[in-house]
Amino acid sequence: MYRGIHLLRTAAALAALAFTSTSILADPPAGKPPEHPEHPDKPKQPEFAKDLPTQAQLLDALKKVVDVGGDDNGGFGLNMWATMVNRDGIVTAVAFSGNDRGDQWPGSRVISAQKANTANSFSLPKLALSTANLYSAVQPGGTLFGLQHSNPVDTENAYKGPSSNYGQNNDPLVGHKVGGVNVFGGGLALYNKDGKLVGGLGVSGDTSCTDHNVAWKLRHALNLDNVPGGVNPVSKDDNIVYDITLDVQGHPVSASGWGHPDCGLGEKAIAVKLPTDFPIGPTP
């Protein structure tokens, strides 16, 4: 009789263990719902990136905007890097337009991240500043001289590997603050359709003037250009300003204080038309 009771208890214990094991395998941890049960192959956008496009969306838009070997954006017609950061300066996505990470200047990966961080860091809910707008103010004697040294790049996050992941969905920069301040064209603040400032975009890989043109078109393609206003004296937005002339002593002077040099490869004519050809404001 004792043996029979012992066998029954053992069987019951094994059954309970089997049920528990099955439940653990079948159910997600408490408080954590399964990711995209209707699309199990689609990764969930992390919380820090919820207000911004996915890496795939950034990549697709970048490839459409970059005109390799052409003159749609001025400059040399090179491949480009693009990086987005959220409002806290955390990198949410990195992409490149070429077929491999070596098809565009390797150094421009971190520069694009710097630009994204700068545009986000020095823009406000009611005032957008592009990195191009900062050029004149940071020159010796300018009102923001030294700004470019104020927030250094976090080199540990910027350069950790493996390099094969650079520009991919799992780029080592993603999820980290890169820091850095860049003061030439290519960085723009991102405003959603409701006018909320949600982060910054940085583009690098050609002349700084072309970088700005590509960034403007890319921001427009992502529908994140509902800009509230800026310092451009003509268009009243964050478009690049070309008003630098030489004074009697041969020193460059910006009439507005927000000027950027003309790179001289057709970029200026394109930039002047950006507010008309790619107007700011939400796309329905």
Regions found by a protein language model. Give the residues of each.
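Flexible, solvent-exposed loop/hinge segments and secondary-structure transition points
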Residues: 28-284
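N-terminal signal peptide c-region/cleavage motif recognized by signal peptidases
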Residues: 20-21
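Bacterial N-terminal signal peptides that target proteins for export
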Residues: 2-11
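Short, linear, compositionally biased motifs with a strong N-terminal bias
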Residues: 14-17
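Boundary at the C-terminal end of the N-terminal hydrophobic targeting segment
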Residues: 24-26
